[in-house]
Curated annotation (Swiss-Prot):
Gene encoding the protein: aroA
EC number: 2.5.1.19
Name of the molecule in the record: 3-phosphoshikimate 1-carboxyvinyltransferase
Family to which the UniProt record says this protein belongs: Belongs to the EPSP synthase family.
Keyword annotations from UniProtKB, A to Z: Amino-acid biosynthesis, Aromatic amino acid biosynthesis, Cytoplasm, Transferase
Catalytic residue list: 314
Source organism per UniProt: Pectobacterium carotovorum subsp. carotovorum (strain PC1)
Amino acid sequence: MQESLTLQPIKLINGTLNLPGSKSVSNRALLLAALSEGKTRLTNLLDSDDVRHMLTALAALGVEYHLSSDRTVCEITGLGGAFTASQPLELFLGNAGTAMRPLAAALCLTDGDIVLTGEPRMKERPIGHLVDALRQGGAKIDYLEQENYPPLRLHGGFQGGEISVDGSVSSQFLTALLMTAPLAAQDTQISIQGDLVSKPYIDITLHMMKAFGIEVRNENYQRFFVAGRQQYRSPGDYLVEGDASSASYFLAAAAIKGGVVRVTGVGRNSVQGDIRFADVLERMGAIVRWGEDYIECERGELHAIDMDMNHIPDAAMTIATAALFAQGGTTTLRNIYNWRVKETDRLAAMAIELRKVGAEVEEGNDYIRITPPAKLKAAEIGTYNDHRMAMCFSLVALSDTPVTILDPKCTAKTFPDYFEQLARLSELA
């Protein structure tokens, strides 16, 4: 019997939430700190499955670190250069793309015999574009099961040089190459083929590399130049921003049934592109206020929108369920093909589950159209082992209809106490 959680109708949502650390920033920071010269103290680190997988892998690679009892402060002693692996290793990375992709690249700097594997879903998430790019730079990589997918066997060999990478599926491939290139023997020039998706995530990478002492020349997101034979330097203390994707559920909830909700840990100067989610809520009719380290949202009458969501693919999922509460017809979210290669095929999953609560849905190859029903229906929502599906569909409870979330613990990937925090800010009908 699958575990489930039934959320009763919520009449008001109000209060302040201190956001858990960003998954994207946490795993990048751990890797950069491990490769750096010196000790780094990371604060507000996310405690979640994906981060635990990265920490376990780093420990297996000989990185020494100390975690606080609540696992949000981590002191890491950097290696001062690339990993070394004296004996064969197998690293299990769960379903953590933010560990699999960057480690696949970084471990190509070391001669060894390292296998990267993960959960069944990880073996369905494409990595061929990254492998092709690494091979152009001299890396020796074998597919152990299916061509273009993990598990991978790495034998080092990456030297840098001229590389082209397809940018149309995942920005994590480019992030992985950028973070590895400074430690290569040669300078690296990376040319992007196709349209680069999720550009703001590349900005996070570049911003963080700079914090760890490395400059990258970015030519309009078409070409990137990175000098080789460099060294990352620890910034000493590094504060991990709150997770802007996690903020989206609470900001949307306030837009639908506020009160006022304030999320702290992100603000107008955040490095994360997903803060732009608040602009989308504002376009729909919510009232949004920005501070240095907070975003606040207040209820407004929400209207349907038609928008390109390529810049905020993760947070855009929250708009899909917020659309159930929009007046004036059909909401269209465009240019979201990369939903299909995430924790699950999110486009297909979203369409199936939105129909269960009564919405009329058109699912395109790279878009979704959502027309809300006059009244939402109570339903059991499948979550596909995808943390964002569980959190998105919790918003259905902001109607006068309860909703049942199957496998609610899947939020542990990024937000283990999500449902407790939602309950804390909620007043039930």
